[in-house]
Amino acid sequence: MRSRSVTAAVCGLLLVSLPSTAFGEVVRHRDPADDVARAAVGSNVYAPAPDQVRGDIIATKVRFARRAVWIRYRLQDLAPTGNGNFHVIGLRSDRRERTIQLNAFPGHWEGGAVVTNTRAQAVGCLVTHRIDYDRNRIGLRVPRSCLGKATWVRVGIRTTVAGTTYAYVDDARAAGYSASLVYGRRVHREP
């Protein structure tokens, strides 16, 4: 009986002493459902559209591993219909700021990503993405080098779905419409 306790204690100490995995810090956030806002196409006046589910962000996950920031978010409904869906992902770090524009529209529903700096100039950054319409999810991998080898990052996410008469927008961290992107708390890189 005593040998089992000693064995369990030794195993516990060994597990604690092992180096951490390469997953880094993970931050999850649940966005309130039914907080989409709408504006007539060509207008910048937004009003609540609680019945709109397409483009409604409901959960985000940010993981800062050794070599990359992994971003995944889920929507109530994401479909390859209408005039397109457009996503803005902002990244602020202790080194650099980057904005990723991920646009998917008729004929290009797989989407294309462009990364810009604070002066809205395109920068060479090999961001990879995947839009999964069946699971209503979007995932991105941002190499750490794009952020100047940052030690922490804050992420903001906004989705816009364009219809023929209205555009619907949701910010992952704001309840309702916000004129500027709302960023989450710092996510630290794995040492």
Where do the model's predicted regions map?
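Secretory targeting and sorting signals
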Residues: 1-24
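Order/disorder boundary and secretion-linked terminal/linker segments
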Residues: 20-84, 95-120, 165-191
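Hydrophobic residues positioned within well-ordered beta-strands of beta-sheet architectures
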Residues: 69-71, 87, 138, 155
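Residue-level recognition of well-ordered beta-strand positions that form the cores
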Residues: 72-74, 90, 141-143
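A short, polar/proline- and glycine-enriched secondary-structure boundary/capping micro-motif
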Residues: 81-85, 150-153
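Aromatic-rich beta-strand patches that line glycan-recognition/binding surfaces
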Residues: 85-94, 155-159
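Acidic, glycine-rich flexible loop segments
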Residues: 115-148
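Ser/Thr/Pro-rich, low-complexity mucin-like regions
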Residues: 135-177
